[in-house]
């Protein structure tokens, strides 16, 4: 064979795939669909790194494998192109975000093509394309019409450094302080009027439907914890000597008889109404001090603080007077902004009671110092005396309901999605406010509402986005009145919440209207996504919001599946050679470009899949890449051997074992062990120096999803097949060849290994003894000694006992 020139071969096949649109999704309802999806990338200036290649190769292997199994495969690619990173880069460089975003997209696309990924490029989309975000804006309008998008005065995470509001999942905690995920700028709490999406309306469905999907359990648990559903009871307390009442939520209503004080958040509207004159000065001072703290500071402080209001509440069952305090560890947005304190059975309440000398009443037998928080028998508890926790909770809740003092209730940690960003580079809201402050939606036929060009996109400094400076764009006529557009833009997560649907609806004419019968038919054909591969960092951001939007689409009848992504796999991070996370600042980030030139895309793909299990973290190694290249060179040279029309008998067992193993491993995404099995097969071929034509082509099919360029080249130039392997039929195995006809038997002398025999399975015992005693190394070790006995364990061991 001619020399294996990887770049020449790879460029040839990449051109062939593009020119012939080989991976275009077919309009085929007769074959079962398979939708393989990558978490689409943000197109940064630095381009793809080898971590991207890992996930993208894994999905490409599956899409090629499924195509060969006869599925109608959808495997698209697009770009998550809006958002803060681009805007920050534009501010730093003075460049227009639109121009460099599309330059970056071109570079990313080049890299993905050069890695040999089989993508349907007719489905390509970018969240910044007007024809795409037209539908993002259209979806917002439908959310508004259904009461799920509302303007609210909310306490938001304000980042002065970025000049915008951030969602909870866009914030990190460093040294106890809230900072932005991007740039680590300080973040504070601040009240602002914002667009909010009412994801909390879907909290129970988001929880319950996790049972429908095949996701990693740790990721499901992250979503469960983020939603944070708690079961308990709301209990009403009356303020003594007044007509005022307040409610608390507790998960432990069974401890009601152990309540010795109540604590309101400093922001609770009742505080200013019930504080006594004697305590007012201290209370007001404490409220001002609380305003200087973030929520994180308030709940993280080990020493709980508070002040007495001077007021008392009546115990709802005993009418005993209970002091009412305020404490900053009680947050206004959680529960009811008020707690009943049971210091004998809650660690936080116990610390507070000890600090301020408040009463402690045990109502569950625990016998421990400090707070007892476990299960136990109730006492001093009226009608629930003698009961354990679960039964006591149910009985006391019913008792409170009967007395109109409480009711069963659920609370959630999940908060509605703050959807406004005070930045330029995002989807504009299709909203106009008239002079009376009334909201008017931009008509559907006027969408998309595009961003105006601005030479300077620095935040306005007033809390509004740079769009406040675009006067010609900002002010419009609305029914003869002066109207003003919304200056906020949508968050980056808006476009990514439905892009998996966008791929399906993408056509030569734009996008099939989401509410059309045609859209319903094609969405029913391809949804849900069969395999979604991406990182765990999106667990409580993109993945949660996409599920929310999908359920909204389900309610509108646009989709028939309750969940968007049936199987989710989190690929492990590829670390730097120093075992730390790759980053440009550390200088350990690895670009695939140089390696594709020097070793080839097939070698890079093979190496990344051979490094270890897909889900595991793995350090980068140039030496490992060399090994992958050597294996492919070995496969190339293997086709210099004689190729016979008939299968080679000596290879039949290992060939069929390899077909079975690789097929099963591809299904499990266990690519590293599939490669190991193919290496075993190649080693066996090198022993025989001959291979059957069907065995040769079958092996090429097995390797093709991982090394598509090399295998297609051999298939065409050596085997003279003109059908692309990727559309050939996946090989099958014959069970009869999987039955082992030979076994390896160990020979021991006095229990020590002295040799091995390759013999027919179930060989006659006397024949096996004879072969063992004739083994050259055994003869040496028994010479001059007396053989006492020979023990045979069939198909495993012959042990010769001598003295």
From Swiss-Prot:
A motif ('HIGH' region) lies at residues 41-52. GO terms for cellular component: cytosol. GO terms for molecular function: aminoacyl-tRNA deacylase activity; ATP binding; leucine-tRNA ligase activity. The keyword Nucleus does not apply. A motif ('KMSKS' region) lies at residues 581-585. ATP binds at residue 584. It is an enzyme of class 6 (ligase). Coiled coil: none annotated. This is Leucine--tRNA ligase.
